[in-house]
Amino acid sequence: MQRVTITLDDDLLETLDSLSQRRGYNNRSEAIRDILRGALAQEATQEHGTQGFAVLSYVYEHEKRDLASRIVSTQHHHHDLSVATLHVHINHDDCLEIAVLKGDMGDVQHFADDVIAQRGVRHGHLQCLPKED
């Protein structure tokens, strides 16, 4: 491991310290290493043909006209990407789904876009991780 020196604006350093404290890092170096790993992983997943894993989470209104069946249809259309799906009833109207996906990151992004773009889907978020050799 090597030691490096960086220069940060006071506001950015304060933000880093606040983030480090909230997330329970023992020091700034650990926080910066995790931030860099996250940025590198995100960049790697944007390369065409990259294999990886992803978690797609979203909330949707299960009573919205045909929405549940449209989502299921989209999932079946991309069955080769799906590893597992967790379905949670949040309240009378809303459901949370969490899908674990595996495959080409371009295909995963396309699947996520198809789901998140559905009318009645809210809070859609895709977290991608490149497959490490």
Swiss-Prot record:
InterPro entries: Acetolactate_synth/TF_NikR_C, ACT-like_dom_sf, Arc_rbn_hlx_hlx, CopG, CopG/NikR_regulator, Ni_resp_reg_NikR, Nickel_NikR_proteobac, Ribbon_hlx_hlx
CDD domains, per database record: RHH_NikR_HicB-like
Cofactor: how bound: Binds 1 nickel ion per subunit.
Cofactor(s) listed: Ni(2+)
SUPFAM superfamilies per the UniProt record, alphabetical: ACT-like, Ribbon-helix-helix
Top-level division of the source organism's lineage: Bacteria
UniProt GO MF annotations: DNA binding; DNA-binding transcription factor activity; nickel cation binding; sequence-specific DNA binding
Biological-process GO terms, alphabetical: regulation of DNA-templated transcription; response to nickel cation
Binding site for Ni(2+): H76, H87, H89, C95
Any Pfam family: NikR_C
UniProt KW DNA-binding keyword: yes
Entry keywords, A to Z: DNA-binding, Metal-binding, Nickel, Repressor, Transcription, Transcription regulation
Subunit text: Homotetramer.
Function of the protein: Transcriptional repressor of the nikABCDE operon. Is active in the presence of excessive concentrations of intracellular nickel.
Family, as annotated: Belongs to the transcriptional regulatory CopG/NikR family.
Cited NCBIfam families: nikR, PRK02967.1, PRK04460.1
Protein name: Nickel-responsive regulator
Organism of origin: Salmonella typhimurium (strain LT2 / SGSC1412 / ATCC 700720)
